[in-house]
Curated annotation (Swiss-Prot):
The keyword Glycoprotein does not apply. The record marks 41 as: Blocking, abolishes the sweet taste. InterPro entries: Cystatin_sf (IPR046350), Monellin (IPR015283), Monellin_B (IPR002095), Sweet-Taste_Mod_sf (IPR053768). Taste-modifying protein; intensely sweet-tasting protein. Keywords: Taste-modifying protein. Heterodimer of an A chain and a B chain. This is Monellin chain B. Natural monellin has not been mass marketed to the food industry, primarily due to the challenge of large-scale purification of the protein which is relatively sensitive to heat or acid treatment. Pfam families: Monellin. The keyword Signal does not apply.
Length: 50
């Protein structure tokens, strides 16, 4: 899938913007790996630290 840079609010201040693969619903930035697509309109910010 295509990679889209999205803003995840408060986290952006510390971690910057995240690249999210819309097709696979997984994004990676630094040491964070997301198991859900995170959008500004979402309240859920589920992630796992490697």
């Amino acid at each position: 899938g295509e990679w889209e840079i999205i803003d995840i609010g408060p986290f952006t201040q510390n971690l910057g913007k995240f690249a999210v693969d819309e097709e696979n619903k997984i994004g990676q930035y630094g040491r964070l790996t997301f198991n859900k697509v995170i959008r500004p309109c979402m309240k859920k910010t589920i992630y796992e630290e490697n």
